[in-house]
């Protein structure tokens, strides 16, 4: 009953437009006072500090800054030109370019919002010029950008790994196959729509154009190789890889492409600071809520109540998917992770689900939730760029959401899909 009151209070505050971080912190502090006493407030400042200073979380601002640098230093534009030269000649090619570029960008930024801002600001206006509807342009940009929280290095996985005390590198490896499946599914859907609605082609395929685009994008292509190669090869941790991503983006954008001056760098840093502040404030205030939840042993109570109904992993995963989809529809991805992970981890451990497997289930649910109103943070960003109504765009976006849902079902009930590479490399 207490857990239901907490969730109801959070949703009530969010629905009256209280910032999510403030809502979580308020519920946490009130819970501490009511159930632990006023004297327990002395623990709140230290809990706030400790919650936001876990070492793995250092990767979050660094990857956010790397994404901002990519967006302002010509790196993302060169990736767009390369993918256009590769698949633009296919009917509906610009939509497929959108998917491909989002997957490339995801391998560096790890953020769906950064992805949609970088790719959407360039591709959505181009798609509208070529007679793609604003709704379709916004929908495919949003759906493909959501792959950024599945494809490594995902900020959502870093956050989950830090909270669940799970290997972030293994989470990254587990996200490779689901991310590719999601991208292929969206590309196939684009091809189907292109044939059905006679969508335009770009210029005819040209080997010389492809060669030129590849030469210009070569250094941009080295970024994911450096970052992911270093992490997967065991040469660096995810946090160190994030630092290398920033350094590489600075060198490539500033010294090689020469598009990164002090003014551009200042703008990128400011954008990065704003995005980081949002995430880290959520992390800090959620630690206070976690203090209250732990003291009340609410996660353990939830595990006992669900296992009293069923211990069948199939049924439990179905219930968790419903819960996660609903949370993803109303909460920012980071807020949903911070809220749900401490609550459900005892249940996950009790029924024998691998935390890595559950991490992929969680992030896929959030990818779908980011596309689904009423909040739909990524879809809303895409619609603002396309200047189109979010509810009208949602109608067009439903088949793309269905593609992501199919990937979710495969990952949920065929654990080998996310876990095969993990077991191959780490035993």
Stretches with model-predicted labels:
Residues 1-427:
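Alpha-helical transmembrane segments of multi-pass membrane transport proteins
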């Amino acid at each position: 009953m207490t857990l239901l009151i907490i969730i109801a209070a959070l949703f009530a505050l969010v629905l009256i437009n209280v910032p999510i971080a403030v809502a979580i912190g308020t519920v946490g502090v009130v819970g501490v006072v009511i159930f632990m006493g006023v004297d327990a407030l002395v623990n709140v400042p230290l809990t706030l500090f400790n919650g936001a200073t876990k070492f793995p979380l250092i990767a979050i601002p660094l990857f956010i800054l790397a994404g901002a640098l990519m967006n302002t230093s010509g790196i993302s534009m060169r990736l767009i030109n390369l993918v256009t030269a590769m698949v633009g000649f296919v009917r509906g090619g610009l939509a497929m370019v959108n998917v491909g570029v989002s997957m490339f960008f995801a391998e560096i930024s790890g953020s769906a919002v950064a992805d949609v801002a970088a790719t959407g600001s360039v591709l959505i206006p181009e798609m509208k010029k070529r007679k793609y509807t604003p709704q379709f342009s916004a929908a495919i940009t949003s759906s493909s950008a959501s792959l950024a929280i599945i494809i490594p290095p995902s900020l959502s996985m870093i956050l989950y790994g830090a909270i669940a005390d799970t290997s972030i590198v293994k989470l990254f490896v587990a996200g490779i196959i689901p991310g590719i499946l999601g991208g292929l599914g969206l590309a196939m859907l684009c091809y189907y729509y292109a044939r059905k609605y006679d969508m335009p082609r770009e210029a005819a395929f040209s080997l010389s154009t492809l060669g030129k685009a590849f030469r210009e994008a070569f250094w941009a292509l080295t970024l994911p190789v450096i970052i992911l190669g270093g992490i997967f090869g065991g040469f660096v941790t995810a946090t160190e890889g994030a630092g290398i991503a920033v350094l590489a983006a600075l060198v490539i954008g500033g010294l090689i492409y020469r598009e990164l001056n002090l003014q551009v760098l200042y703008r990128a840093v400011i954008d990065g600071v704003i995005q980081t502040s949002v995430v880290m404030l959520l992390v800090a205030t959620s630690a206070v809520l976690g203090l209250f939840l732990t003291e009340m042993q609410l996660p353990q109570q939830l595990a006992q109540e669900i296992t009293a109904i069923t211990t069948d992993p199939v049924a439990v995963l179905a219930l968790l998917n419903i819960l996660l989809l609903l949370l993803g529809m109303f909460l920012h991805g980071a807020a949903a992770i911070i809220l749900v992970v401490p609550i459900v981890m005892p249940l996950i451990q009790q029924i024998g689900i691998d935390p890595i497997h559950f991490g992929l289930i969680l992030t896929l649910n959030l990818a779908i939730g980011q596309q689904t109103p009423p909040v739909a943070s990524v879809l809303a960003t895409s619609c603002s760029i396309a200047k189109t109504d979010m509810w009208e765009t949602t109608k067009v976006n439903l088949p793309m959401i269905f593609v992501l849902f199919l990937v979710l079902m495969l990952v949920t009930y065929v654990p080998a899909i996310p876990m095969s590479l993990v077991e191959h490399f780490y035993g």
